[in-house]
């Protein structure tokens, strides 16, 4: 591995111990791809390989254009415990999302549309609201809270209670609030001032049972500069003092 790549992935570390390592993944870095030439977070785990060749194993995913906290297990027992925590819905996740659309009528709420996958084109699967008769409809529940609004844009705190593919993105779109910068679910446009923006979805907090000791580990990934710059351009406050984190 090139030293520059190793230095890059080490700069993303926000927490590490003998059981797990956590990163603040930037937008645009895929977790995994089928293309062997792509730089991915999974391939960058080689920077942490031990003398026996074993390296940390990622135990969950973020969409390539979503930034924020993501964790890898340092050992096989830790990988099993962390994977079980996600499967058993013991992981509490909090995201930030900048959406466009009508102002929320309440301060907070829930979205509970069932979802189903569909092939948008060869090689691209997306999600939609499930229809009567869909054999593989998946229940999905997302909680939201409005943090701030300005000029038809709304900064929301999002807590998904299930972990479906693209759940937050499609749920918000179905509720009339596409995430800014989302080309698949209605938010492809940028700010009124011009220019496209990144997908404005950031995984800010993650709390789950620690795989190597009693209690939980609570991780925080500060919103990156490219996310904060869009908020500033939209006239919205930085989220540091607005988000309560998982509880």
Residue ranges and their predicted role:
Residues 1-247:
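RNA pseudouridine synthases
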């Amino acid at each position: 591995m090139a030293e520059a790549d190793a230095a890059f992935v080490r700069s993303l570390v926000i927490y590490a111990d003998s059981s797990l390592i956590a990163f603040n993944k930037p937008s645009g870095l895929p977790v995994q791809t089928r293309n062997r030439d792509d730089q991915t977070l999974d391939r960058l785990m080689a920077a942490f390989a031990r003398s026996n060749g074993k390296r940390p194993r990622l135990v969950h995913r973020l969409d390539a254009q979503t930034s924020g906290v993501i964790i890898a297990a340092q050992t096989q027992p830790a990988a099993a415990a962390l994977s079980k925590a996600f499967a058993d819905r013991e992981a509490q996740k909090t995201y930030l999302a900048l959406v466009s659309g009508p102002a929320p009528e309440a301060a907070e709420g829930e979205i509970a549309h069932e979802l189903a996958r569909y092939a948008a084109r060869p090689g691209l699967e997306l999600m939609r609201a499930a229809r009567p008769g869909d054999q593989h409809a998946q229940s999905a529940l997302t909680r939201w809270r409005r943090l701030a609004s300005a000029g038809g844009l709304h900064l929301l705190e999002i807590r998904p209670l299930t972990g479906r593919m693209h759940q937050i993105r499609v749920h918000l779109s179905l509720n009339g609030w596409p995430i800014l910068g989302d080309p698949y679910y209605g938010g492809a446009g940028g700010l009124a001032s011009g220019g496209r923006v990144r997908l404005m979805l950031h995984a800010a907090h993650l709390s789950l049972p620690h795989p190597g000791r009693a209690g939980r580990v609570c991780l925080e990934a500060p919103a990156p500069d490219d996310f904060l710059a869009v908020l500033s351009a939209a006239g919205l406050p930085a989220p540091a003092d607005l988000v309560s984190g998982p509880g």
